[in-house]
Amino acid sequence: MAKRDYYDVLGVSKGASPDEIKKGFRKKAKELHPDRNSDNPNAEAQFKEANEAYDILKDPDKKAAYDRYGHAAFENGSGGPRGPGGFGGQGQGDFASAFSDVFEDLFGDFMGGQRGGGRQRAARGSDLRYNLRITLEQAFMGMQKTISVPGTVSCSACEGTGAEGGAEPVVCPTCSGMGKVRAQQGFFTIEKTCPTCSGMGQIIKNPCQACRGAGREEKTRALSVNIPAGVETGTRIRLAGEGDAGVRGGPSGDLYIFIEVEEHRIFQREGLDLYCRVPVSMTSAALGGDVEVPTIEGGRSRVKIPSGSQSGRQMRLRGKGMPALRGAGTGDMFIELAVETPVNLTMRQRELLREFEAESQDNQPETSKFFKTVKSFWDGMKS
């Protein structure tokens, strides 16, 4: 019985793209899978036929041979592309192989692990993380910082190829560049990573002496990083392409800089706002006055203290906080008063305070209010 055209089997045209071929296969595989067609005696044969067609059309080399020679390209004894490891011809079209292939394409890594990964000649380098501690002043101003980052770079001797003299790798003779081989174990066909090329699909005949064929080498690089004004602890800065070098010419990873702003000895930060706790004397709080306070940019501001101020009272200096990270405004600075009780009093100071207390019974509303509340509480307990 003559074989059907592989394109007709998958329901696609001869000019179909790889994605269209894959979609056609997935559709047919779902329709024809034996588990869903227990009442159709032809389902298994049609299922294997679809898998056989996809096995040819998904591979550019096999597809080119099929487009040129048709089914004859894969018949035994022909000059068709029959690669080592059982990839060339239709003898592998048994149900076990078909079952494996359909689950590879329908469910990816769940059943197939890293199948087909050997065809990827290049791989992206790893991302790197760098923790950077800066002061609050540096976070306020922004800065240009030079950091030393250990990692891997493309080997300068072989230009990342891994081969001596920068020569290009050659196709692995064991798997013909597929990165995987198949072995028959009873009813099942087992697919595994090619032991010769470790799944890369290529081998290096003369490894580079400097990097021993890795194509990369360890190196600590000095990088200049722009820290924008307004960063805070947890801010992440991404430097694209500054991570580890890629494998076999693949793109480099990225470098992520995580900012940690040190605690300040004067200011506490909450978002864009700054808080500064300023001690004032008891007389300044009672009589009023003014106090000079520092600002984060290194300047000074005078703040008026209203008479009768209590501990915890806050006064705002607008626009004296931290800048927003992307220039959207500036926070404020809050001055919190801490009224200081005098210590180590002289006899004269004690006498004056006692005289003051005797004269100030009507000048302490909060104290009077508190003790009236306490007296009312006690009276209520007695009744």
UniProtKB/Swiss-Prot annotation:
One of its GO terms (cellular component) is cytoplasm. Binds 2 Zn(2+) ions per monomer. Pfam families: DnaJ, DnaJ_C, DnaJ_CXXCXGXG. GO terms for molecular function: ATP binding; heat shock protein binding; unfolded protein binding; zinc ion binding. It is found in: Cytoplasm. Its main location: cytoplasm. Keywords: Chaperone, Cytoplasm, DNA replication, Metal-binding, Repeat, Stress response, Zinc, Zinc-finger. Residues 5-70 form the J domain. Its cofactor is Zn(2+). Zn(2+) 2 binds at C172, C175, C194, C197. The J domain is necessary and sufficient to stimulate DnaK ATPase activity. Zinc center 1 plays an important role in the autonomous, DnaK-independent chaperone activity of DnaJ. Zinc center 2 is essential for interaction with DnaK and for DnaJ activity. Participates actively in the response to hyperosmotic and heat shock by preventing the aggregation of stress-denatured proteins and by disaggregating proteins, also in an autonomous, DnaK-independent fashion. Unfolded proteins bind initially to DnaJ; upon interaction with the DnaJ-bound protein, DnaK hydrolyzes its bound ATP, resulting in the formation of a stable complex. GrpE releases ADP from DnaK; ATP binding to DnaK triggers the release of the substrate protein, thus completing the reaction cycle. Belongs to the DnaJ family. Homodimer. This is Chaperone protein DnaJ. It comes from Dinoroseobacter shibae (strain DSM 16493 / NCIMB 14021 / DFL 12). The lineage of its organism: Bacteria, Pseudomonadati, Pseudomonadota, Alphaproteobacteria, Rhodobacterales.
